Amino acid sequence: MFLKIHPSRETGDVVAVCDRELLNTTISHEKLTITVTDAFYGNTPATEAEVKAALKNAGNINLIGERSVNIAVEMGLVDKHCCMMIGKVPHAQIYQL
């Protein structure tokens, strides 16, 4: 997985995580298209433990890919049924209010 933390004092850090094979690809389904860029998701490889630590402290979370989303599901941060599917790729956005 790749992990990038976007610091934000107003809303808490934005944590972006994507599965390795999705970086720098474009995923489409019907009218929705998402390009998974290293500018947003980073290019720093992260272990599952590093991803979990980052998610614990996040104000906002953006996840794309089976492994990335499953970590948040296992942590109880999101219900798998609430995740959007872009084709066969799960995507989740989690916001603290």
Positions of predicted regions on the chain:
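Conserved mixed alpha/beta catalytic, RNA-binding, or beta-rich assembly cores of soluble enzyme
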Residues: 1-49
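Solvent-exposed alpha-helices and their adjacent loops that cap or buttress functional pockets
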Residues: 6-10, 53-56, 84-85
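Structural motif
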Residues: 13-16, 59-62, 92
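Fold-independent oxyanion-binding glycine-rich loops
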Residues: 18-20, 64-67, 97
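Short, surface-exposed, polar/charged, turn-prone segments marking secondary-structure boundaries
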Residues: 43-46, 63, 89-92
